[in-house]
Amino acid sequence: MPSMAAHNRSALLLTLVVLLPPFGVFSASVEAAETRELILAAYSVPKEAYERHIIPAFQKHWKQKTGQEVRVRSSYGASGAQARAIIGGFDADVAVLSLEGDIDQIVKAGLIAHDWRKAPHGGMISASVVALGVRKGNPKGITGWEDAARPGVEVLYPNPKTSGGAMWDVIAIYGAGLKLAQQPAAGKPAAPEVAEAQAIDLLTRIQRNVRIMDKSGRESVTTFERGVGDVIVTYENELLPRVKNQRPYEIIVPPQTVWIENPAAVVDKYADRHKVTDVAEAFVAFLHGPEAQAAFLELGFRPLDSAAASSPVTKFPQPTQLFTIAELGGWDQISTKLFGAQGLWTKVVEDLAKK
């Protein structure tokens, strides 16, 4: 005859079998309840868009879709510095940077395996133009690049060695010099070598006026807000929200400026290591979607469709001589030409330091 202890054990096992759900249901419940973690590395400029709008909206979206909470650990800094940190071991699952050249460096390091340009708009998630910020009332009478190059005008932009935004700034100045050379008073465009010389001259005269080169675009704006400088060269979207909030300066969009596009990509090696590839891919897809795009637009970015950017609905000024990186040969060519060891901007800075 079974003992009383054996009888009790049998009763307990029967109770557990009745009360516990099937294994598959139980594991699904645990998975739905778990908190996933995503590490985001971004350039400094769009911090407010992410922290105030995009990240909370994505967390809500992911919760509704999967039942899971997602915690986003975000890091913001100069684009080039962020790219180097990722290559050096900062294990970000998603990189949102200022320029495609920084993403390409991560690709070359073997950390991004997929073709990130196959995403909508070639992998770009936001757009802007390089603009000039001036003091309220424009006391220096700045209307364009030549005015920023006048003696006695103090200019700010960050350091291209650390800041992707600064690279855009310098490219805008150089490209503007080429555009200006194509419309001389005589009506005949300058020869290529003459246009190049004029572009270098404009770059030299503006660089001579640069008071401080901060590490990032955001630091440069902070310096300008402290009262340093007459003109800041920066993203238009850095200036628009501040003017809207009654900051004491104005925006000048030069006729000659560059069309800016900013990329985002999953960092495959780290996302796979953390087992969050699904979350990372969903986050990047969310950045291309209407909710994130509306947040970018609200904070001064332009629509990725340049035609829409000039529509009456968005009311962005349309520069008459807007140009793109592609017109200057693409990122690989222009970055080497301007910022390489023997680059034009590099030589300008070195020559000015000797004087």
Feature locations, PLM:
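Periplasmic-binding protein-like
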Residues: M124-V129, I200-Q207, D214, N245-T277, ...
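Boundary at the C-terminal end of the N-terminal hydrophobic targeting segment
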Residues: S27-A32
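Short beta-strand->loop
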Residues: A41-S44, V134-R135, V153-A195, I206-V210
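N-terminal segment of the mature folded domain
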Residues: A33-S163, V349, A353-K354
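N-terminal secretory signal peptides that target proteins for export/translocation
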Residues: M1-N8
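Extracellular/periplasmic juxtamembrane helices and adjacent flexible linkers that interface
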Residues: A271-K355
